[in-house]
Amino acid sequence: MRNKIKLKIIVIACFIFSIIACHFSPETQKSISPALSFDSTSLKARILQYKTWTLVNAEPVKMSAFMRAACADVREEIISPHFDKYIRVYVNELGREAMFKEENPKFPIGSIIVKEKLPAKDSEDPEFYTIMVKRENGYDSVNGDWQYLTMDETKSRIEEPENISSCQSCHAPYNDTSDYVSREYLHLEGRRMQREVKEK
């Protein structure tokens, strides 16, 4: 009788241990961290690695007048709609597939898009950065659960812009077509490449 009780205890203990081991396995931990951690420290650390991500446009793309004006509302002292501005865009691995999907992309949680805002096409020194982070469901469902951030030219300060409604209103028209991501730079890049092919 005692042996049967001991055997049951051993079986139950093994079962519980297997569940715990599975839950805390390295594979499971890898899938939930650090890519889906949104505390300011880990998020900043990921953003600062953006140069190792996929470069979306091979060359800086000239911003449209609409985009320049929208960004001017965020950083008026630097960006002016009266001067040409260029952007260079990077996307992390989580958002890469959605970025290049032709129709109705859905960016997964943890996707990050970094835009370098350049004063000239040949500039290597961005004057500031705008950032989109796809947050967890329910973070801001009205605006597609995207978090909008800016980063100064020194990369030392990452924060939400004071006039965040400017970012939200700029991206709102793209909610049904590309999950609030304009991807205008992809189309501009494509037209530039087509022109180069025709000229050859």
Predicted regions and their residues:
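N-terminal secretory signal peptides
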Residues: 31-103
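Sequence context surrounding c-type heme c attachment/ligation sites in exported
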Residues: 26-33, 37, 52-63, 99-200
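Disulfide-bonded cysteine motifs in exported proteins
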Residues: 9, 17, 66, 162-165
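Bacterial N-terminal signal peptides that target proteins for export
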Residues: 2-10
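C-terminal motif of bacterial Sec signal peptides marking the signal peptidase cleavage site
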Residues: 20-21
